[in-house]
Amino acid sequence: MRLLRPSWAGLLRGRHHQHQRHHRRLLLTTSRGSNGEREEQQHSQWSSPGSRSEQLFYAAFWAGGLTLGYHWLTDKKNHVLLEGQKVASEEELEATARLWHVTNRRELPTYRAEEVEQHNSVEKRIWVTYGLGVYDVTDFVENHPGGDKILMAAGSAIDPFWGIYQQHNTLEVLELLEGFRIGNLEGLVVTNVDDELGSPWSQEPQRHALLKPASKRPFNAEPPIGLLAEQFYTPNELFYVRNHLPVPVINPEDYELEIEGGAKDKTLTLDGIKALPKHSVTAAIMCGGNRRSEMTKVKAVKGLSWGAGAVGNAKWSGARLCDILREQGVQPDETKHVIFEGADLDPTSHPYGASIPLAKALDPRGDVILAYEMNDEPLSRDHGFPIRVIVPGTVGARNVKWLTRIVVADKESDSHWQQNDYKGFSPSTDWDTVDFSKSDAIQAMPVTSAICTPQPGARVKVDDDEGHITVRGYAWSGGGRKIVRVDLTNDEGVSWHVAELEQEEMPDGRHYGWSLWTARLPVSEAQRRAGDVEIWAKAVDSAYNVQPEKFEHIWNLRGVLANAYHKVKVKII
């Protein structure tokens, strides 16, 4: 893409499409030494963007942070760019926004890269650059829960990370970012993101065409919900995919798993893990943001817009973690944690990480395994090949894929995903008052259920003989709690009907797999005449936890733990 310097009125005509057709080019300062040289890193597809990569990576956190902060900063946004201008459509507005950072703002001063670098603390004001723009994000940092990470990006460029964290490259984020602009950057060269970063997405695996992406880079997708209730074990190729970074390429012959924190450290190979006694467990894995799209209807939240399909049920096989840790001399201690790290690395070689209590890891009834098989087949790359830790009954975020390191530690993982993500809050907590350090990381998920068929808006034929409609779905509760009942109503709770359950017979506390259910609901003559029926479903687990009725009562700014009644409107024919 060539540098564009038309007037703002010209920008509003949205003629940028010809420059966006094939790929994005990024603008980097010459003072950063942008020479296109590549440096390979072990276990990673990244190339180094420069000597300040440690700082540059955290620019990605505040790129994501801009999305998080959009809601609390909406009233503070600077709309001066669009004053007096009229945008013909939302598409043209977005077209304009995507040119802001490559356009000189003549009314603003110009700064050299050396000047920007000096603004690297709250005291000196925190400046960052994107393309031709210089931005002062000090006020944002002081209020944002991930401010300590954002601070590490101070005085540097965020350009490389827009090509990686593309889910944040939205109109809202671009508009918010431009509101922080204070000037133009002097002395730029044009660089292709693939040349600069080694195209970390070039070796992504093939996916089934039926998976519906919530984001493409990183790839996150769920199957059509209508397919979920058809089989007790979710087919591997239709199991939802949740990735936070590019999928790593791992040679199984070179694979090693480091284990630390016992009497002595140990390294296991893939063959070494497979030589250990094999154990299998049926377990559902559910993303913490499953059904977030329903919660968003109450009020906007931050996160991928998952439907009810970010869950799957599988038979996982591998070595038991409790056996491995005990062989290492690890003793029970309810105050300790087990940290897991994957091979999916960010540009600074920081891995995805998470942790669980040591008590869960050492409990044979906890069934935590180092899995190398999924439904009797080798793990696919999207699902963690060659080894994924499976923590039954626990939120998907703790089931770390591409496992490379296990550490028994006194504290939880300090990773972003353990400390500043996957946590719940009060409906009254907003981005002005949130404090991630005061909320526990999600472990066991709450009881939930979903209607898989019929789907919203479907035309459903009533059984002529008995006047019923058939409804199918899934139910699950974290912590190994059994689903004891699924109730359905099609008259807003006046009458309830109990579904028939299909589930694995397991001892109490070890019901890690989901339950599929089927119900036949009577349709009254009045409902037939009205033509529309709304079906509600709620599940009850063995602790008699019940789904809440409304999302208004459990809304949280991250959109996690979305387990209110599942409601589907259909047309009766």
From Swiss-Prot:
Signal peptide bounds: none
GO cellular component terms given for this protein: mitochondrial intermembrane space; mitochondrion
Keywords assigned by UniProt, alphabetized: Heme, Iron, Metal-binding, Mitochondrion, Molybdenum, Oxidoreductase, Transit peptide
Biological processes per GO annotation: intracellular sulfate ion homeostasis; sulfur compound metabolic process
Principal cellular location given in the protein's record: mitochondrion
GO molecular function terms attached to this record: heme binding; molybdenum ion binding; molybdopterin cofactor binding; sulfite oxidase activity
Pathway(s) served: Energy metabolism; sulfur metabolism
Co-factor binding comment: Binds 1 heme b (iron(II)-protoporphyrin IX) group non-covalently per subunit. Binds 1 Mo-molybdopterin (Mo-MPT) cofactor per subunit.
Composition bias type Basic residues, residue spans: 14-26
Feature: transit peptide: 1-34
Pfam families membership: Cyt-b5, Mo-co_dimer, Oxidored_molyb
Binding-site positions, heme b: 144, 168
Alphabetical list of InterPro entries matching this protein: Cyt_B5-like_heme/steroid-bd (IPR001199), Cyt_B5-like_heme/steroid_sf (IPR036400), Cyt_B5_heme-BS (IPR018506), Ig_E-set (IPR014756), MoCF_OxRdtse_dimer (IPR005066), Mopterin_OxRdtase_euk (IPR008335), OxRdtase_Mopterin-bd_dom (IPR000572), OxRdtase_Mopterin-bd_sf (IPR036374)
Catalysed reaction equations from the record: sulfite + O2 + H2O = sulfate + H2O2
Phenotype on disruption: RNAi-mediated knockdown in larvae results in reduced levels of sulfite oxidase activity. RNAi-mediated knockdown in ensheathing glial cells results in larval locamotion defects, including reduced run phases with more stops and an increase in head bending frequency. RNAi-mediated knockdown in the cortex glia, astrocytes or neurons has no effect on locomotion or head bending frequency.
Expression tissues: Expressed in the ensheathing glia with relatively weak expression in the CNS cortex (at protein level).
Moco domain, as annotated region: 200-423
Residues covered by region (Disordered): 14-50
Localization (cell): Mitochondrion intermembrane space
Enzyme Commission code: 1.8.3.1
Spans annotated as Homodimerization: 424-567
Role according to the record: Required in ensheathing glial cells for normal larval locomotion. Oxidizes sulfite which is required to maintain glutamate homeostasis and as a consequence, neuronal network function.
Miscellaneous notes: Named 'shopper' because of the mutant locomotion phenotype in which larvae stop and bend their heads more frequently.
Protein name: Sulfite oxidase, mitochondrial
